[in-house]
From Swiss-Prot:
Alphabetized UniProt keyword annotations: ATP-binding, Cell inner membrane, Cell membrane, Membrane, Nucleotide-binding, Translocase, Transport
PANTHER family: ENERGY-COUPLING FACTOR TRANSPORTER ATP-BINDING PROTEIN ECFA1 (PTHR43553:SF24), HEAVY METAL TRANSPORTER (PTHR43553)
Name by which UniProt lists this protein: Putative ABC transporter ATP-binding protein BH02760
Domain of life: Bacteria
Cellular localization per UniProt: Cell inner membrane
Job description of the protein: Probably part of an ABC transporter complex. Responsible for energy coupling to the transport system.
Length: 226
């Protein structure tokens, strides 16, 4: 089993303390991170894959330090942004799915095999040559997730993956995340979405104020917000 460790992590931007002395270990398969806007949750997950580096303390993924092993960690930790338009870089679905794989220095045959596999897995075969900008919000998000899954990281971070979606597409993305073999760490405001997770971290003013199973954590979060 893999492990993500935060050891006395503080994150400061100017005079603003975004995270304060966070020490935690993550080992569960489905972990939700919730809290009010500005509570530090997005900064927390961005520290995991090295999108940000801690001002103080250490973050490690399976023993690799984010400050010293950035390249290895980027291969181990995938990241899905809230808005798929910030992630999809090429105009056609197949081109975009192939883009990240080519950065792994795979052969043409290996790239094609992985793209074919992921298109079939998520029932996207008919969209192979479609223009991404013509897809629905849910389809775009599925393409963005597919691109990350195809790279076979050990962990995938999702930053508000259902915020921009209607109910039907929320259910689709929820199912996709539930069926992942990788560890999923999900930032979300959607409490219904995270009810079946293994663990929930509640952030407030840069600190983890609740760390428990969903039933307990969500109840306490609602109490604090009321």
């Amino acid at each position: 089993m893999g492990i993500i460790k935060f050891d006395k992590v503080t994150q400061v931007f100017g005079d603003l303390y975004v995270l304060r002395n966070i020490t935690v270990q993550l080992t569960e398969r489905r972990i939700a991170v919730i809290g009010a806007n500005g509570s530090g949750k997005s900064t927390f997950v961005r520290l995991i894959n090295g999108l940000q580096l801690p001002s103080h303390g250490f973050v490690s993924v399976d023993g690799l330090d984010t400050k010293n092993d950035a390249k290895a960690i980027k291969h181990k930790v995938g990241f899905v942004f809230q808005n798929p338009d910030n992630q999809i870089v090429l105009p056609l679905v197949e081109e975009d799915l192939s883009f990240g794989l080519k950065n792994l220095k795979l052969s043409k045959e290996e790239v094609k095999e992985r793209v074919d596999e992921i298109l079939q897995r998520y029932d996207l075969q008919n969209f192979r040559n479609h223009a991404v900008h013509l897809l629905s919000g849910g389809q775009k998000q599925l393409v963005a997730i597919s691109g990350v899954v195809a790279m076979k990281p050990d962990y995938i971070i999702f930053d508000e993956p259902t915020t921009l979606l209607d109910l039907r597409n929320k259910r689709l993305i929820t199912q996709v995340i539930e069926e992942l073999s990788q560890t999923a760490i999900v930032v979300s405001h959607d409490l219904e979405f995270i009810r079946n997770f293994d663990r929930v971290l509640v952030f407030d003013k840069g600190e983890i104020v609740v760390d428990d199973i969903p039933l307990v954590a969500i109840k306490e979060y609602i109490r604090r917000m009321s």
